[in-house]
A protein has these predicted regions:
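Carbohydrate-binding surfaces of carbohydrate-active enzymes
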Residues: 58-72, 77-191, 196-598
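Mature N-terminal, pre-catalytic/accessory segment of carbohydrate-active enzymes
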Residues: 1-70
Length: 598
């Protein structure tokens, strides 16, 4: 139209900010026919409930043929492309944070780019470091927290209630903008993550590059940690997702991706890409974002043995409890203050750069760990040198370059140290509070608490330099210096070999994986005396066969061939056959490279 906006500009130099507010602009990405319309406002509980009720009114989950037949309602990852506002936001912000967002709005908003990620470019006014640190970053932190609270109340809680009213479990990939990567999974019946096939799977694991050959996505460890904290026995995963090597992927790469997925805490794999395609459908059938699981694939005859293997692994892990006595508090609050919440599992910023490598090094060295949050720490009990939350119990808390804490979190950490626990602050020591309101008072309170703890128990609250380069070597040094006793000592740790420790009744279960598809791994495992007193077995998930092992003085020499995984199980049962000696290997093996004839 011909509408005009008049601005009365006083004398001097000014920067004019303007906003474009769009209502209902977002549409479902690649929606199926009939489901490609507008995206519901996830911050409006009434709109969410109306949408869900329309669905259940048509499907009748609680009566008729579907009653009791549907296990769960599934919600895929949240790719909301910039959904950051809802009617009443100003009032909600002031009610929750105690001050008005209005005067700060131009400075906390960031230009929105693809998938809701902020555009990384300079624009608008420039501010001093003090204003950026003490005002803008603190208000931004509060704004993200209000969005996170509104999302939980208006979508997660509404979705959960709707599922349970309809006799369904809630299964959700609960991460991304406006969702806490640990806590949101704790609210759900079946939290889910995702594992992808990327270039280099089984061949490379570059440091500080969360896509480099990993298989599991960076969010998997967050999701599984939340599930274990909430005592969930199912950690689901959209597995074998694939966009770059759909037809070139080998079954060997599929196996390694699945094994690594399990190492990240997954115990329930949902095969992505196992799509139904009518036989009359031309090559390559119906496939979207999945690996080519199809009867026309050359390795199709071998899919069933792999699926049997996955079923055995899942059955064992679902009936066992992953063990962890190290808690990791990542600097999420600092990240959100400085850079904003991220679009997990593909964050625009990884903070610090090694953030997704630390838990790997812990498990590559024989220890076990969970991510925790400030809320988890505050709700934990402390006694006997342990931080306890539900069934989880930790002897050591790693603060990963954490600078900011709520005063109540700092106080709980002090209680933990006073009770005999150990805190290792990596790179930085917490010294300030969170949020804009009463910032100076909260800063002083946090600093005073931490300073007192450091002065009183310098041997139990320690600061160490952040890793530079060799994460595994750095952690091994930390492990030795501070007595971080592993569940089994690994003589020759390797980035491609990882071990998870589980308990099931009186069984001690070690899941050991060689995720290299190019080389074998030879190592010596030394088990604690109370474990080694039981009979050792090897459970072969590829065949379902069990054999006893001869473990002398608690030590086992273990060789894993490329892409091989084994369960080493200690139990009281001593009746069975010993593992046969391995067949001799050729002294002159032939490498099958390039084109060859049979």
């Amino acid at each position: 139209g011909n509408d005009t906006i008049m601005v009365d500009v006083p004398e001097g130099e000014h920067v004019l900010y303007f906003f474009v507010k769009l209502n209902g602009y977002s549409r479902v990405i690649l929606g199926a026919p009939g489901a490609s319309g507008p995206v519901v406002n996830h911050l409006d509980g009434k709109a969410v409930e109306r949408y869900l009720d329309k669905f259940s009114d048509a499907m009748h989950f609680t009566r008729g043929k579907l009653k009791g037949k549907i296990r769960a309602a599934f919600c895929d990852s949240f790719e909301l492309e910039g959904n950051n506002w809802t009617p009443g936001m100003f009032a909600e912000f002031e009610k929750r944070m105690g001050y008005s967002l209005d005067p700060f709005l131009p400075y906390v908003f960031q230009r929105t780019g693809a998938m809701g990620e902020p555009v990384r470019e300079a624009y608008g006014s420039s501010f001093s470091p003090e204003v950026t640190r003490d005002v803008i970053e603190r208000v931004r932190h509060d704004f993200w927290h209000v969005q996170m609270q509104l999302f939980k109340e208006n979508f997660i809680d509404v979705y959960n209630d709707w599922c349970h009213r309809n006799g369904l479990k809630s299964r959700v990939q609960a991460y991304g903008h406006q969702l806490h990567p640990v806590e949101t999974s704790m609210y759900l019946d079946i939290p889910e993550c995702e594992s992808w096939i990327h270039d280099g799977i089984g061949r490379v694991m570059e440091p500080n590059q969360y896509l480099s050959g990993r298989g599991y996505s960076m969010v998997n460890k967050f999701v599984s940690s939340g599930a274990f904290l909430a005592n969930r026995n199912i950690v689901s995963c959209e597995e074998q997702t694939n966009v770059g090597n759909i037809f070139q992927t080998t079954l060997e790469e599929v196996k390694v991706t699945g094994d690594r997925s399990n190492l990240s805490g997954v115990n329930h794999s949902v095969l992505h890409g196992f799509n139904y395609s009518p036989r009359q459908k031309d090559f390559f059938g119906w496939i979207q974002f999945g690996t080519y699981f199809n009867e026309n694939n050359t390795w199709w005859p071998y899919v069933r043995p792999w699926m049997d293997y996955k079923a055995r692994v899942s059955a064992l892990l679902q009936n066992s409890v992953y063990q962890a006595d190290i808690a990791i508090l990542p600097p999420l609050e600092d990240l959100w203050s400085i850079h904003g919440m991220q679009r997990d599992p593909y964050p625009g910023v990884t903070y610090p750069a090694y953030a997704n490598d630390l838990w790997e090094a812990v498990q590559q060295s024989g220890n076990g760990c969970d991510y925790v949050s400030e809320k988890v720490i505050c709700q934990s009990s402390v006694a006997g040198g342990r931080l306890r939350f539900g069934s989880r119990s930790y002897k050591t808390l790693l603060l990963m370059e954490v600078e900011s804490l709520e005063p109540r979190t700092a106080a709980r950490i002090a209680d933990f140290v006073a009770a005999g626990g150990r805190v290792i602050a990596i790179g930085k020591v917490p010294h300030k509070g969170l949020g804009f309101r009463d910032a100076a008072a909260k800063d002083a309170r946090v600093k005073a608490i931490i300073d007192r703890v450091v002065a009183t128990w310098p041997d139990r609250f320690v600061r160490v330099d952040a890793p530079q380069g060799d994460m595994l070597g750095w952690y091994r040094t930390l492990q030795a210096e501070y007595g971080l006793t592993p569940y089994a000592k690994i003589s020759d740790p390797d980035r491609f070999m990882m071990m998870n420790y589980y308990k099931s009744g009186d069984r001690d279960i070690y899941f050991v994986v060689n995720s290299s598809i190019e080389r074998s791994m030879q190592t010596r495992l030394e088990f604690p005396a109370e474990v080694a007193a039981k009979q050792a077995w090897v459970w072969d998930a590829e065949t379902g066969v069990r054999h006893m092992l001869d473990v002398q003085d608690g030590t086992l020499e273990l060789c894993l061939t490329p892409a091989e995984a084994k369960f080493i199980v200690f139990e009281k049962d001593r009746g069975g056959q010993m593992l046969p000696a391995p067949a001799p290997r050729s002294a002159n093996p032939i490498a099958l490279n390039g084109i060859w004839d049979v």
